[in-house]
Amino acid sequence: MTPLNKTALAACCLLAGAVQAAPVAVDPAQTYVNRDGTVAIVGNDGLEEVITQLNALFTRQHPQVRFSLRMEGSSAGMPALTAGATAFAPLTRDMWPGDQAAFRQVFGYDATPVRIGYNGHGPRPPAKTPPAVYVHRDNPLAGLTMEQLGQVFTAGAPAGDVHLWSQLGATGEWTPRRIHAYGLRDDGGFATGLRHARFGKRPFAAQYEALASRDAVIRAVAADRYGIAVLGWVNAAPISDQVRVLPLAATPGAPYYGPDKATVRAGNYPLTMPVQLYVNRAPGKALDPLVKAYLQLALLPQGQAILDAQQESEEGYLPLSETDLLAERRKLDAL
């Protein structure tokens, strides 16, 4: 057994004992507690099966706690957390900037995310592929680094902006050709979240052409040998066979990875979207004991097994890698 495995096992045993030994009670003064005494959870509808099973697991250990679900989408979870109408917000992506600003305006600090898994892998038609870079199938590049991706799609990158394929190492007919970047509109959704979370909040480059739909983006790249796009949650196969997913490296010199199951499960894919539970925890104050116990359970082997069982579902959720699992447990211990 490796030292990391031993550390993980020891941490798991200690955490399991702590969770099982500490009873929790529903505080009726909490705004997320309904009149009938149930604990409200509002969040992503694709997570309903996961949260239902986590609730059942939690209730077996704490029979006095009951839950009510309203799973309407990630866009419903954060407003509910801001309003105090949910114990936590289950999301299958990072919080969008508008939701972050609204929460901060009310409380004066940011909501805290705790990852419990990864959201999706692919390509695996007919399921949707998680966020990925798409190029024309004739594109000669083996991959890009995340830094290069930011240089292509945004203006003002620290290492300079990139406008030509030759700047990325392409040769021959590609040497003089300009890069045509495509994506979704910068309207507070996926594209805006991408800018904020991955590209330092920089504005999109002048060469970025925003289109109205995912299908339109795929078709644009399929018709443009010099096109490139960053897009999430699309099954490109029925739209066009003229595009391919371009692998990514987290840092210069690191291996290129695509969003396949093994890579996502290992925590190596740079554009992986997390399955995470956002909580309201004021700086310097302890996290609500019931919420903390729930999150601890989600990070135990029993909780991770619930994510693992979803790997071939439409959503394709995966449990955390050993490294990320330890990191989230340590984060939670400090809350």
Model-derived features with residue positions:
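Flexible loop/hinge segments at secondary-structure junctions
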Residues: 22-335
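Gram-negative bacterial Sec-dependent N-terminal signal peptides
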Residues: 3-19
